[in-house]
Design a protein with these regions (language model features):
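Acidic, mature catalytic/reactive cores of soluble proteins
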Residues: 1-367
Length: 367
């Protein structure tokens, strides 16, 4: 099992392409952080000496697992920061290229990545005699990690809209109907299609899909995923729930298990860090708005209040021309009345002494 703990019957020979994508993304992110450390004068980093096995070109994972099965010695050694960054970056690129070459499922004006291998070592997804088999999880991690190229991401969106999207039940289903009890992969196939992990609109993964799309610049597509969840949750006649994000919407669009989901926190995280674009970056506060026209009020404004590094911020975006994302840029920015520099896309907010701060960003046309 990876994110989907109902894929639990392929322990001997199964593989998670989805999480391999995630590993590639993590390796690249670590490489980037190491380069920042090097730029700031940290020429070496100290790590547990057992980790050196994982940096060798040969497959030493079994040796590493055996060595660390019960404990680590606690001894450390120093590694050259830039050399380590280059090693991790190369590992990330090898994983990505391998997945792009071996796991891409090409269709006519559509495509997606295979997410898993079953316990018989067979690819799970693709075009089958009994119908198309597609799972959302592999697409989320491929897009989020940068494994999917921009062109592939566009094709994934087309395939997801065609095979997984059902607006009337909340948006993007977790998978298509496999029409079998596939117990060489997981117990999820014991559920009726549209229930739980077998083809329900699983809110957590839908929000992660939106988050991934926003990160990669597919703003309208990300908005569609978020808005579909919200509209279904707010439609009592369909969802039969009080307003909120449930674990999943079933085949009838009914929301279930409010208390058993990480989707709510991911939804808030995505809205703050991607939609409003307010996030921490290497210790500083950055604002990179990605709101679409519909998300501004009747006066062309959008506002968010939050805390960052112990300080309170009220951030207002003014869009007087009611421009859509892609048509606007940041034309001016200020904090507590003091102008801030912007490149038109984002603003890096200088550290503030005040405990309460007001930020105003004005958006205008790109031309």
């Amino acid at each position: 099992a990876d994110w989907n703990d109902a894929l639990d019957m392929a322990a001997e020979h199964g593989e998670s392409v989805a999480f391999t994508c995630a590993y590639a993304g993590n390796l690249e992110e670590l490489a980037g952080l190491l380069r920042v450390l090097a730029e700031r004068g940290h020429r070496e980093v100290e790590l547990l000496e057992e980790l050196e096995l994982l940096l060798e070109k040969e497959n030493r994972l079994p040796d590493f697992l055996h060595l660390c099965a019960h404990s680590v010695r606690g001894s450390k050694r120093r590694f050259d920061t830039l050399a380590l960054a280059d090693t991790l970056q190369a590992m990330a690129e090898r994983l990505r290229e391998h997945i792009r070459k071996t796991e891409w499922i090409a269709g006519e004006n559509e495509g997606w990545f295979n997410s898993y291998y079953d316990n018989h070592q067979n690819r799970v997804e693709g075009y089958f005699p009994g119908g198309v088999r597609m799972m959302l999880t592999g697409q989320v991690f491929a897009v989020m990690s940068g494994t999917a190229t921009p062109a592939q991401t566009s094709l994934i969106c087309r395939a997801a809209d065609r095979y997984l999207y059902r607006k009337e039940v909340g948006g993007y289903r977790l998978n298509t109907d496999f029409h079998e009890e596939k117990f060489d992969l997981g117990r999820m196939f014991g559920f009726a299609y549209g229930e739980k992990e077998n083809g329900a609109v699983f809110s957590h993964m839908s929000v992660m899909y939106a988050n991934a799309l926003y990160r990669r610049g597919f703003i309208r597509e990300g908005y569609k995923a978020l808005q579909s969840l919200a509209e279904t949750a707010m439609d009592f006649e369909t969802s039969r729930i009080y307003p909120g994000i449930p674990e999943y919407f079933n085949a009838d669009g009914r929301g279930l298990y409010h208390y058993l989901t990480g989707a709510a926190s991911w939804y808030i995280l995505t809205f703050i860090t991607q939609v409003f674009g307010v996030r921490g970056e290497l210790g500083g506060l950055v604002i990179e708005p990605k709101l679409v026209r519909e998300q501004f009020d009747g006066e062309g404004a959008a506002q968010i209040s939050l805390h960052f590094a112990g300080k309170a911020y009220e951030i207002t975006l003014q869009n007087p021309q009611r421009l859509d994302y892609g048509a606007y840029k940041i034309v001016s920015a200020s904090c507590n009345g003091e102008p801030m520099q912007t490149d038109g896309v984002r603003v890096r907010v200088p550290a503030q002494d005040a405990t309460e701060n007001c930020i105003l960003l004005t958006l205008g046309g790109r031309l």
